[in-house]
Amino acid sequence: MIGGFTMKHKLKDPGSAITHLIGMILAAIVSIPLIIKSFLSGDYVRIISLIIFTISMIGLYGASTAYHSFNISPMINKKLKKLDHAMIFVLIAGSYTPICTIVLGGTLGYGLLSVIWIIAILGIVFKMFWVTCPKWVSSVMYIAMGWLCIVAIAPIIHSLSKTSFGWLLA
Protein backbone atom coordinates (compact mmCIF):
# COMPACT_ATOMS: atom_id res chain seq x y z
CA MET A 1 0.00 0.00 0.00
CA ILE A 2 1.34 3.42 -1.01
CA GLY A 3 -0.46 6.50 0.31
CA GLY A 4 -3.72 4.60 0.77
CA PHE A 5 -3.56 3.16 -2.77
CA THR A 6 -3.83 -0.60 -2.96
CA MET A 7 -3.64 -2.41 -6.28
CA LYS A 8 -6.33 -4.84 -5.12
CA HIS A 9 -8.88 -2.09 -4.63
CA LYS A 10 -7.92 0.45 -7.28
CA LEU A 11 -7.07 -1.42 -10.49
CA LYS A 12 -10.24 -2.64 -12.16
CA ASP A 13 -9.11 -4.63 -15.22
CA PRO A 14 -5.32 -4.57 -15.60
CA GLY A 15 -5.28 -6.71 -18.77
CA SER A 16 -7.63 -4.41 -20.67
CA ALA A 17 -5.99 -1.32 -19.20
CA ILE A 18 -2.54 -2.40 -20.38
CA THR A 19 -3.63 -3.45 -23.87
CA HIS A 20 -5.58 -0.22 -24.37
CA LEU A 21 -2.64 1.81 -23.07
CA ILE A 22 -0.42 0.05 -25.61
CA GLY A 23 -3.03 0.83 -28.28
CA MET A 24 -3.01 4.49 -27.28
CA ILE A 25 0.79 4.67 -27.40
CA LEU A 26 0.94 2.89 -30.77
CA ALA A 27 -1.81 5.15 -32.15
CA ALA A 28 0.20 8.19 -31.09
CA ILE A 29 3.40 6.80 -32.64
CA VAL A 30 1.85 5.88 -36.01
CA SER A 31 0.05 9.22 -36.09
CA ILE A 32 3.31 11.15 -36.20
CA PRO A 33 4.34 10.28 -39.80
CA LEU A 34 0.70 10.54 -40.91
CA ILE A 35 0.38 14.07 -39.56
CA ILE A 36 3.83 15.09 -40.84
CA LYS A 37 2.98 13.84 -44.34
CA SER A 38 -0.33 15.71 -44.26
CA PHE A 39 1.42 18.95 -43.27
CA LEU A 40 3.94 18.47 -46.07
CA SER A 41 1.06 18.20 -48.54
CA GLY A 42 -0.08 21.71 -47.61
CA ASP A 43 -3.68 20.55 -48.04
CA TYR A 44 -5.66 21.94 -45.09
CA VAL A 45 -8.54 19.51 -45.59
CA ARG A 46 -6.09 16.60 -45.41
CA ILE A 47 -4.36 18.07 -42.35
CA ILE A 48 -7.56 18.70 -40.40
CA SER A 49 -9.12 15.37 -41.40
CA LEU A 50 -6.10 13.37 -40.31
CA ILE A 51 -5.78 15.31 -37.06
CA ILE A 52 -9.45 14.53 -36.31
CA PHE A 53 -8.82 10.86 -37.08
CA THR A 54 -5.71 10.61 -34.90
CA ILE A 55 -7.30 12.49 -31.99
CA SER A 56 -10.33 10.20 -32.16
CA MET A 57 -8.11 7.11 -32.16
CA ILE A 58 -5.89 8.28 -29.30
CA GLY A 59 -8.95 9.58 -27.42
CA LEU A 60 -10.76 6.25 -27.63
CA TYR A 61 -7.77 4.29 -26.35
CA GLY A 62 -7.13 6.89 -23.65
CA ALA A 63 -10.72 6.81 -22.40
CA SER A 64 -10.75 3.03 -22.50
CA THR A 65 -7.45 2.86 -20.61
CA ALA A 66 -8.85 5.13 -17.89
CA TYR A 67 -12.12 3.19 -17.66
CA HIS A 68 -10.39 -0.18 -17.37
CA SER A 69 -7.71 1.11 -14.98
CA PHE A 70 -9.44 2.93 -12.18
CA ASN A 71 -11.86 1.61 -9.60
CA ILE A 72 -12.08 4.70 -7.42
CA SER A 73 -15.80 5.03 -6.76
CA PRO A 74 -19.08 3.95 -8.37
CA MET A 75 -19.72 7.53 -9.54
CA ILE A 76 -16.31 7.88 -11.24
CA ASN A 77 -16.60 4.39 -12.72
CA LYS A 78 -19.97 5.34 -14.21
CA LYS A 79 -18.55 8.54 -15.72
CA LEU A 80 -15.53 6.74 -17.17
CA LYS A 81 -17.79 4.05 -18.63
CA LYS A 82 -19.96 6.71 -20.29
CA LEU A 83 -16.86 8.41 -21.70
CA ASP A 84 -15.44 5.10 -22.93
CA HIS A 85 -18.67 4.22 -24.73
CA ALA A 86 -19.15 7.75 -26.10
CA MET A 87 -15.65 7.66 -27.57
CA ILE A 88 -16.68 4.72 -29.76
CA PHE A 89 -18.97 7.13 -31.60
CA VAL A 90 -16.13 9.64 -31.88
CA LEU A 91 -13.75 7.02 -33.29
CA ILE A 92 -16.25 5.82 -35.89
CA ALA A 93 -16.95 9.39 -37.02
CA GLY A 94 -13.25 10.26 -36.82
CA SER A 95 -12.43 7.26 -39.02
CA TYR A 96 -14.96 8.37 -41.61
CA THR A 97 -13.62 11.92 -41.69
CA PRO A 98 -10.57 11.38 -43.97
CA ILE A 99 -12.51 9.01 -46.22
CA CYS A 100 -15.36 11.49 -46.67
CA THR A 101 -13.17 14.57 -47.12
CA ILE A 102 -10.06 13.27 -48.88
CA VAL A 103 -11.30 10.24 -50.82
CA LEU A 104 -14.87 11.26 -51.63
CA GLY A 105 -15.10 15.03 -51.20
CA GLY A 106 -17.94 16.93 -52.86
CA THR A 107 -21.59 16.65 -51.96
CA LEU A 108 -21.46 12.89 -51.36
CA GLY A 109 -18.43 13.04 -49.09
CA TYR A 110 -19.50 16.01 -47.02
CA GLY A 111 -23.13 14.84 -46.92
CA LEU A 112 -22.09 11.43 -45.62
CA LEU A 113 -19.71 13.07 -43.15
CA SER A 114 -22.53 15.28 -41.84
CA VAL A 115 -24.83 12.29 -41.32
CA ILE A 116 -22.08 10.33 -39.56
CA TRP A 117 -21.20 13.17 -37.17
CA ILE A 118 -24.90 13.86 -36.44
CA ILE A 119 -25.37 10.21 -35.47
CA ALA A 120 -22.16 10.36 -33.42
CA ILE A 121 -23.35 13.44 -31.54
CA LEU A 122 -26.74 11.83 -30.88
CA GLY A 123 -24.97 8.70 -29.66
CA ILE A 124 -22.76 10.72 -27.33
CA VAL A 125 -25.79 12.55 -25.95
CA PHE A 126 -27.59 9.23 -25.41
CA LYS A 127 -24.56 7.74 -23.64
CA MET A 128 -23.98 10.78 -21.45
CA PHE A 129 -27.52 11.82 -20.53
CA TRP A 130 -29.93 8.93 -21.12
CA VAL A 131 -29.00 6.95 -18.03
CA THR A 132 -31.25 3.98 -18.80
CA CYS A 133 -30.40 3.83 -22.51
CA PRO A 134 -30.67 0.16 -23.54
CA LYS A 135 -27.49 -1.37 -24.99
CA TRP A 136 -29.29 -2.24 -28.21
CA VAL A 137 -29.80 1.46 -29.01
CA SER A 138 -26.08 2.21 -29.10
CA SER A 139 -25.35 -1.11 -30.80
CA VAL A 140 -27.77 -0.27 -33.61
CA MET A 141 -26.20 3.18 -33.92
CA TYR A 142 -22.65 1.74 -34.06
CA ILE A 143 -23.68 -0.75 -36.74
CA ALA A 144 -25.63 1.84 -38.74
CA MET A 145 -22.65 4.18 -38.70
CA GLY A 146 -20.36 1.39 -39.84
CA TRP A 147 -22.63 0.38 -42.71
CA LEU A 148 -23.41 3.89 -43.94
CA CYS A 149 -20.34 3.70 -46.17
CA ILE A 150 -22.35 1.39 -48.44
CA VAL A 151 -24.02 4.47 -49.95
CA ALA A 152 -20.59 5.48 -51.26
CA ILE A 153 -18.93 2.11 -51.80
CA ALA A 154 -18.56 2.43 -55.58
CA PRO A 155 -16.78 5.82 -55.46
CA ILE A 156 -14.64 4.63 -52.55
CA ILE A 157 -13.53 1.51 -54.45
CA HIS A 158 -12.92 3.57 -57.58
CA SER A 159 -10.83 6.16 -55.71
CA LEU A 160 -8.62 3.85 -53.66
CA SER A 161 -5.88 1.48 -54.71
CA LYS A 162 -6.39 -2.20 -53.89
CA THR A 163 -3.89 -1.88 -51.05
CA SER A 164 -5.63 1.19 -49.61
CA PHE A 165 -9.03 -0.48 -49.88
CA GLY A 166 -7.60 -3.54 -48.12
CA TRP A 167 -6.38 -1.35 -45.27
CA LEU A 168 -9.80 0.29 -45.10
CA LEU A 169 -11.45 -3.12 -44.69
CA ALA A 170 -8.93 -4.17 -42.05
Roles of regions detected by a PLM:
Residues 2-170:
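Multi-pass alpha-helical transmembrane bundles in non-GPCR membrane proteins
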